[in-house]
């Protein structure tokens, strides 16, 4: 068994624990390991942590973290700088009165202006803030119904693997790099993590 550092798009580092990784496919910043590559890890807790660490390549990516701010302003860019122009969370995360998110963000990306879009464009609730948190802290938060929108783990699997706003991260439009892998691969990692016991990396 060995631990390998994996660089995330956000600049953070996590430790991937695995067996026989020399036979695994080469990894780049834009790929995710398949669930089957973790099947040699016999201990459920160790496998769950390894799976969530891999899913963390998506979770800690700026495409995701920027919409999970700890304050009232969304973030932008790979460096996570405050949104320009100045906008605030507002009621329900949809922006202030007279300056709703959909004032500028349409139902789809507007590539000429590099403006991202989705029919339900909005911020995650502040209880779901990820900015400045470790992957382990986010993991515990994702499991906590008081901080995940009241979702069960099965609903989390569905949300991560099928929600179209989550899926925007793989289709972010001009000027933005997508999150690694595919939403199907990401959803499979989250499902396998839950099935292995949903243990979290250390904070």
Language-model region placement:
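Detector for methionine-enriched segments
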Residues: 1, 13-16, 91, 99, ...
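C-type cytochrome heme-c attachment and multiheme electron-transfer modules
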Residues: 46, 53, 62, 109, ...
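The canonical Cys-X-X-Cys-His
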Residues: 63-71, 98-108
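Short, solvent-exposed loop/turn and secondary-structure capping segments
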Residues: 68-70, 76-80, 112-117
